[in-house]
Amino acid sequence: MTDSLVRATAAKGGIRLVAVSTTESTKEAKERHSLSYLTSAIVGRAMSASLLLASSMKVNHGRVTLRISSNGPLKGLTIDAGRDGSVRGYVGDPSLELDLIKNKSNHYTFDFKKATGIGYLHVIRDDGKGEPHNSTVELINGGIGEDIASYLLHSEQTPSAVFVGERINQDGIVCSGGLLAQILPKAERDYSLIDLLEDRCKEINSFSELLNKKGNNLISLIEEIFPDLDQSPSDIISTSQEVRFKCRCSRERSLSALKILGKDELQKMIKEDGKAELTCQFCKNVYLVKEDELISLID
């Protein structure tokens, strides 16, 4: 089953809803980076959030980079997501595992706050025109959802509800995904609609349980959470696209990166090793560059 993203409008166009499933993408990230249960959850949540943000980019080649820099044992996180549904990412310490903690609902959950520690969430939007737009906010709790909502409120002045979650058991990743709900400008003074949206969001005790219940049926997930935004499910207008873990690295890019090192550094590689080996941080692909290729980079 492939991952997907659904964009929808409801309440006669007054609310923007985006839902995404990242189960398979998270599984691939786990395999490529040998992620622990904890870091699988964090990466899955961050990939979901990044795709939700990228979904609003106006150009198909637009991209969003989400980065956490903090003092926690996670040692940072970087996710790159595209409007086209591609996503990739990595964490500083992929093997990190911490004791579970009880949440407000008395359920055991991952200790995201301890993992990330105190620090910042950086969001970079790049539409390919001029300099990318950078925003930074303080981390709220490291669980990604509230952190992204804080970013949207303070950096984009857009009141939003952001939910991310996952279900992981001893057999691995069962599900991973997210949901974004925003009041659009045409309805920003419709206080009854705003109150309704807030009430529905407050009723969500465990987004992860809802996600597990609905699987990849994202429209059904939206209808389960917001049953009274419209008179009937058909009033929700939606479009869907495929989501996948996809890295933009290539042999050509690796050679270009080596060339930037300069003649002296390349000659040192040739003399000491007779080759170069480059590993992509995002996907762990390894590119072996032989001596004759290094020589050609100098010429």
UniProtKB/Swiss-Prot annotation:
UniProt keywords, alphabetically: Chaperone, Cytoplasm, Disulfide bond, Redox-active center, Zinc
PTM notes: Under oxidizing conditions two disulfide bonds are formed involving the reactive cysteines. Under reducing conditions zinc is bound to the reactive cysteines and the protein is inactive.
InterPro entries (UniProt xref): Heat_shock_Hsp33 (IPR000397), Heat_shock_Hsp33_C (IPR016154), Heat_shock_Hsp33_N (IPR016153)
GO biological process: protein refolding
GO molecular function: protein folding chaperone; unfolded protein binding
GO CC entries: cytoplasm
A Pfam family the protein falls into: HSP33
Subcellular locations according to the entry: Cytoplasm
Covalent S-S links between cysteines: 247-249, 280-283
Main localization, broad class: cytoplasm
Function noted in UniProt: Redox regulated molecular chaperone. Protects both thermally unfolding and oxidatively damaged proteins from irreversible aggregation. Plays an important role in the bacterial defense system toward oxidative stress.
Assigned protein family: Belongs to the HSP33 family.
HAMAP family, sorted: HslO
NCBIfam families: PRK00114.1
Name of the protein this chain belongs to: 33 kDa chaperonin
Gene behind this protein: hslO
